[in-house]
């Protein structure tokens, strides 16, 4: 919660507005660390700021309540590989490298959290599960989108991050036989290898099913 956060990070008015509106939820805040912070340099990579998120998942929140310290919890994927949205994906990706898995079922949203830098002027560093229009409305001003693969200051800025390991193209209408097609909405088409992310084109449902679909294809 925000009280434990204050022990390690400096908070500001913009953070308070977003925290009250969207946390717990799919938003990650970049905040300045306090000089007396006890967060390990292995977590911060010796940087003076920290990425913080408040999970909404009931089981994970119960786990956090039993701890008297924050938990470093990166996404369940190897760098440049697909994110896992359920236990089967984690096992496929990591195999015997992980001894224990806390199974909370399939991810509710299915996409990474939206990352917003609040150290200076608010800026989006990674698009994700929270609509930036909602963030803009809450703050009351325009937000910069600073997604620069060359700087790579946040997860997801690399062009290969979360990639399926096979070529991926957008808006393809015709192709060879060894190609799979992913459709947002279910429709009657004459294609053998096609998958749909939502029965009626619901974007929230499509987002939830995207990574699972890519994992099936690869």
What is each stretch, according to the model?
Residues 1-218:
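Active-site-adjacent structural elements in enzyme catalytic cores
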């Amino acid at each position: 919660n925000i009280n434990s956060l204050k022990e390690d990070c400096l908070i500001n008015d913009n953070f308070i507005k977003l925290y009250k509106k969207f946390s717990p939820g799919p938003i990650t805040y970049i905040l300045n660390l306090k000089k007396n912070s006890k967060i390990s340099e292995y977590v911060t990579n010796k940087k003076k700021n920290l990425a913080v998120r408040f999970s909404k998942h009931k089981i994970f929140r119960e786990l956090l309540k039993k701890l008297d310290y924050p938990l470093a919890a990166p996404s369940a994927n190897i760098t440049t590989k697909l994110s896992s949205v359920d236990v089967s994906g984690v096992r496929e990706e990591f195999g015997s490298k992980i001894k224990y898995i806390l199974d909370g079922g399939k991810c509710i949203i299915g996409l990474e959290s939206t990352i917003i830098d609040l150290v200076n002027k608010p800026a989006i560093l990674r698009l994700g599960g929270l609509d930036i229009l909602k963030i803009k409305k809450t703050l009351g001003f325009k937000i910069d989108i600073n997604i620069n693969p060359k700087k790579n200051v946040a997860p997801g800025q690399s062009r290969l991050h979360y990639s399926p390991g096979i070529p991926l193209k957008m808006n393809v209408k015709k192709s060879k036989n060894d190609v799979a097609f992913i459709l947002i909405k279910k429709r009657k088409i004459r294609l053998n290898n096609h998958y749909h992310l939502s029965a009626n084109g619901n974007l929230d449902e499509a987002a939830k099913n995207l990574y699972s679909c890519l994992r099936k294809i690869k």
